[in-house]
């Protein structure tokens, strides 16, 4: 139990501009529909220490007259992130009513792909090429569409062959303008291997550097299976493709809309879900992971133009909380939720280069006087290792039902370390703990046994050396 340890310090937050490299990002989506004020969020996002910000390109907001592109609105966003040391990556989307009459009725032209007429296809090609050219040197990663396997984002009905051809062509346009740009495809929200394989059969993999996927779940252990399956499938078509976790998250209260809306979320549970999912993503070996999202905002995926009530579908996924005005725009002070501080701690701990590693560590399943029960076995706990040039981290937690069950128990660990120093870090509040001598048995030859090592339903880190 954590109360047996001695607190000796606190994780110091790092600003994004002070972090050279990181695998952790935050969603900054939906500004194509102007749903929140980015000016009130930039500094708070940078203070969290994320290194990636996902944007949506907003074709309909940018090209209101055929062939005329007004990039001013998104220029400001991209420049603000670049100035703060954050890499913007852009999801190219959605439709445009000047090319597609069906999009005239759809708020934000969401889910109206330009694939049916030569004029639509040419309009999209010209827009993509203009966008990539305009942002060359500032934007390096481009994602093709968003959740095309969902009815809300491919409104005439999801079709994997259509998506594959669309992605293939868009990837070709991107590479023609900027051969160094990275192209991300898939962007899928389901676990439909058949859909993804059918899309790959069109040849889209020839133009992809990455496949992204969205994993909204209260069970973060599902991430490992998803990453393994999608990676192996992608490698069949192109062995160079890697994975990006493009959206994950949970809500901070009940009564919301969007993914996982029906569950009994609280701000505390949201913070737990962020911690467990983010570190699971890091364990899975994805290129980077992006949490959805920076801000409480309307979902705005199924709105009708002229009918405000149709898109007042509030989602409470943000690490920043907000109020809403009569038009559904996020207003107020944009306060920091507990999940924000947990994200900030994780960003600080995992700043810089690190790699996955195995740890010479075992759990001893013995009777515990503290719990009057047997200690947890390693097979009952999620575990993973990381190392850098200065130390190692062993991350672990008990994967209880995050919505119903909190855990504060103990186990016994035996491990080898080449370092003289080891501590425990709680990512939830950033506390750094020393292990009291009475809990340590020194076995010699670099081997230690820790009795009554705390285990929680949120990640604890056994840190050896100077990883942090």
Regions found by a protein language model. Name each.
Residues 2-130, 143:
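N-terminal substrate-binding region of glycoside hydrolase catalytic domains
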Residues 363-420, 459-461:
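Carbohydrate-binding surface patches
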Residues 22-28, 53-55, 88-92, 140-144, ...:
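Hydrophobic faces of well-ordered beta-strands that scaffold small-molecule active sites
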Residues 35, 103-233, 254-274, 407:
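Active-site cleft segment of glycoside hydrolase catalytic domains centered on the general acid/base Glu
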Residues 414-433:
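Solvent-exposed beta-hairpin/edge-strand motifs
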Residues 258-370:
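Aromatic/acidic polysaccharide-binding cleft in carbohydrate-active enzymes
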Residues 212-259, 277, 287, 291, ...:
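Glycoside hydrolase catalytic-domain groove-lining segments
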Residues 436-468:
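C-terminal beta-strand-rich structural cap/linker in extracellular carbohydrate-active enzymes
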């Amino acid at each position: 139990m954590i109360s047996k340890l001695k607190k000796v310090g606190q994780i110091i937050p790092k600003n994004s501009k002070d972090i050279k490299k990181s695998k952790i990002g935050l969603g900054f989506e939906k500004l194509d529909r102007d749903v929140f004020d980015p000016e009130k969020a930039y500094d708070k996002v940078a203070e969290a220490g994320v290194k990636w910000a996902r944007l949506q390109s907003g074709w309909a907001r940018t090209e209101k007259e055929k062939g005329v592109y007004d990039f001013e609105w998104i220029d400001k966003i991209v420049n603000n992130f670049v100035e703060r040391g954050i890499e913007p990556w852009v999801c190219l989307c959605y439709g445009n009513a000047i090319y597609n009459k069906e999009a005239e009725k759809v708020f934000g032209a969401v889910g109206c792909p330009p694939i049916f007429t030569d004029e639509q296809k040419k309009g999209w090609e010209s827009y993509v090429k203009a966008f990539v050219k305009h942002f060359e040197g500032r934007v390096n990663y481009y994602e093709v569409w968003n959740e095309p396997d969902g009815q809300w984002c491919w409104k005439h009905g999801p079709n994997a062959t259509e998506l594959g051809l669309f992605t293939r062509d868009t990837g070709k346009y991107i590479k023609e303008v900027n051969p160094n740009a990275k192209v991300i495809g898939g962007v899928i929200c389901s676990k439909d291997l058949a859909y993804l394989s059918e899309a790959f059969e069109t040849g889209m993999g020839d133009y992809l550097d990455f496949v992204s996927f969205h994993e909204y779940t209260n069970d973060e252990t599902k991430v490992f299976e998803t990453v393994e399956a999608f990676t192996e499938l992608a490698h069949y078509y192109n062995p160079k493709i890697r994975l990006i976790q493009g959206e994950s998250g949970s809500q901070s209260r009940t009564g919301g809309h969007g993914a996982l809306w029906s569950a009994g979320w609280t701000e505390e549970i949201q913070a737990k879900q962020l911690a467990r999912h983010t570190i699971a993503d890091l364990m899975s070996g994805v290129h980077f992971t992006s949490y959805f999202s920076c801000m409480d905002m309307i979902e705005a995926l199924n709105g009708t133009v002229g009918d405000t009530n149709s898109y007042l579908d509030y989602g409470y996924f943000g690490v920043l909380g907000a109020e809403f005005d009569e038009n559904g725009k996020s207003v107020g002070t944009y306060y920091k939720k507990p999940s924000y501080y947990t994200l900030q701690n994780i960003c600080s701990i995992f700043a810089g280069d690190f790699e996955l590693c195995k740890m010479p560590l075992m759990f001893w399943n013995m009777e515990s006087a503290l719990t009057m029960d047997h200690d947890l076995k390693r097979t009952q706990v999620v575990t993973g290792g990381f190392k850098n040039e200065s130390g190692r981290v062993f991350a672990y937690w008990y994967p209880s039902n995050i919505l119903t069950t909190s855990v504060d128990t103990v186990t016994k660990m035996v491990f080898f370390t080449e370092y003289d120093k080891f501590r425990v870090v709680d990512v939830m509040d950033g506390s750094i703990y020393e292990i009291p001598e009475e809990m340590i048995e020194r076995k010699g030859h670099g081997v230690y046994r820790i009795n009554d090592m705390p285990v929680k339903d949120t990640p604890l880190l056994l840190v050896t050396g100077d990883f942090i």
